[in-house]
Amino acid sequence: MQVNHLLRQAVKQTTRAGRLGSRKPHKPLLPPLQLYRRILREHRNLPTMQRELGDQYVKNEFKLHKSTDNPLYIVGFLASWQDYLHMITRGEWEEGTLSTDLLEKMSPEQVTQLYELMKEAEQLKSGGE
């Protein structure tokens, strides 16, 4: 399968290059299936609603990106999900905030989606629908 070959090549390049964004050089990327399973396993420690939402989102994202063949995109995708895995493993998901830099990089549609998600989350947290 060409995707597996490209993935292996991209992971090797990332490991040799050392740093990608906020990644540390001593943490190589996990293979996609292993990363996917570890994320779902780690979601078991989340409250039920967050687990269901997280599981659904992870499954959808991995399914949508399954046919990607751009090595740089694959590395970025895996690096972001691996950072997410480390964040939920350490319990930092509850205090998560977005930096101004990250918000500036988002499209207007993404900002709107994020705002809608925030409103929904606040409604669920307060107990109303």
UniProtKB/Swiss-Prot annotation:
It comes from the Eukaryota. Residues 1-21 form a transit peptide. The keyword Chaperone applies. Keywords: Chaperone, Gluconeogenesis, Mitochondrion, Transit peptide. It is found in: Mitochondrion matrix. GO terms for biological process: gluconeogenesis; mitochondrial respiratory chain complex II assembly; succinate metabolic process. Belongs to the complex I LYR family. SDHAF3 subfamily. Plays an essential role in the assembly of succinate dehydrogenase (SDH), an enzyme complex (also referred to as respiratory complex II) that is a component of both the tricarboxylic acid (TCA) cycle and the mitochondrial electron transport chain, and which couples the oxidation of succinate to fumarate with the reduction of ubiquinone (coenzyme Q) to ubiquinol. Promotes maturation of the iron-sulfur protein subunit of the SDH catalytic dimer, protecting it from the deleterious effects of oxidants. May act together with SDHAF1. Interacts with the iron-sulfur protein subunit within the SDH catalytic dimer. This is Succinate dehydrogenase assembly factor 3, mitochondrial. It comes from Kluyveromyces lactis (strain ATCC 8585 / CBS 2359 / DSM 70799 / NBRC 1267 / NRRL Y-1140 / WM37) (Yeast).
